[in-house]
Design a protein with these regions (language model features):
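Rossmann-fold cofactor-recognition segment
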Residues: 32-45
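Conserved glycine-rich Rossmann-like NAD(P)H-binding loop of the short-chain dehydrogenase/reductase
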Residues: 16-28
Length: 170
């Protein structure tokens, strides 16, 4: 995503080592063109070891911006599309959180941030599946925080949105 690439560039400018993990070949190509160090998500369970191979250690920080573009009226979605959405937008994230959480637990240190959306609370027509996936992500990260905060791992969710601050009105 544009946000993910901007975040990776900003962190890199601050001296952080970053790795953009992408689900698709298109995402890998965009990150590569932007000069970012990138890796295919593939099987999430192998991500900590693949990071160890690249950086000498598993990830200590995770910013999760993963989401699909699946938007449909709830009653209008094809059953196959719903199953794919659940597997990718919920199941794949759960596997990622589990794998990275376990590797952080072994080190007794980790910081995780899930980037959600205001659609989680207030979806517009056609955003039911997107909103549901964001709510599921928030629940996973909230549960990770509850379960592992006493062991050095913190997790939180951020709901991004536009704010009407009342400025600039004519």
């Amino acid at each position: 995503s544009q946000l993910g690439m901007a975040l990776a560039r900003a962190l890199r400018e601050e001296g952080a080592e970053t790795l953009s993990v992408c689900r698709s070949s298109e995402g890998l190509a965009r990150c590569g063109e932007a000069g970012l160090c990138c890796l295919s998500l593939g099987e999430p369970e192998s991500l900590p070891e693949r990071c160890r191979g690249l950086f000498g250690e598993p990830p200590a920080h995770l910013v999760d911006l993963m989401h699909s573009r699946f938007e449909s009226l709830i009653a209008g979605a094809a059953p196959e599309a719903i199953m794919e959405w659940a597997a990718v937008d919920i199941g794949l994230r759960a596997r990622l959180v589990r794998a990275v959480g376990r590797s952080m637990l072994a080190r007794r240190f980790g910081r995780c941030v899930f980037v959600s959306s205001s659609a989680a609370e207030c979806p517009v027509e056609g955003q039911g599946y997107y909103a549901s996936a964001k709510l599921a992500g928030e629940a996973l990260y909230r549960s990770l925080a509850v379960e592992l905060s006493g062991r050095g791992i913190t997790a939180c969710s951020l709901r991004l949105s536009w704010l009407d601050a009342g400025r600039g009105a004519a």
